[in-house]
From Swiss-Prot:
Disulfide bond annotation, renumbered to this chain: C53-C55, C64-C97, C74-C87
Region (Disordered): 102-139
Identification of the protein by name: Mitochondrial intermembrane space import and assembly protein 40
Keyword DNA-binding assigned: no
Organism: Xenopus tropicalis (Western clawed frog)
Domain CHCH: 61-105
Subunit comment: Monomer. Can form homooligomers.
Amino acid sequence: MSYCRQEGKDKIIFVTKEDHETPSSAELIADDPNDPYEDHGLILPNGDINWNCPCLGGMASGPCGEQFKSAFSCFHYSQEEIKGSDCLDQFRAMQECMQKYPDIYPQEDDEDEAEKEKQNKEAEAFSTETSDTKEESSS
């Protein structure tokens, strides 16, 4: 016996083996690529950049959003043989802006150095413990 149960926002449908083996009669409606309310990826069907795409991680709306949009647009629309090679000024402006907000835009080098420093301290502590243990066992 098939039945349906609502749990909060979820609808749970239990079906029998026979129901599951019967071909579905559900009609799928094709997405309208021109629907302005439909979710799209980074590039919209018309070729424009979707600044609301979650894939940008909020970069387009942060304190350096305008610089990011300028650099990203330049790169996206670049016709140079080496794509984006004509966008150096925009990327420099974006980088300079991001350096003003290190809490929002941490530098990868800073993170890498901090992680390496932490690992070195842990390794030193471990080697000190190991040598102390060896000295105790040899006594």
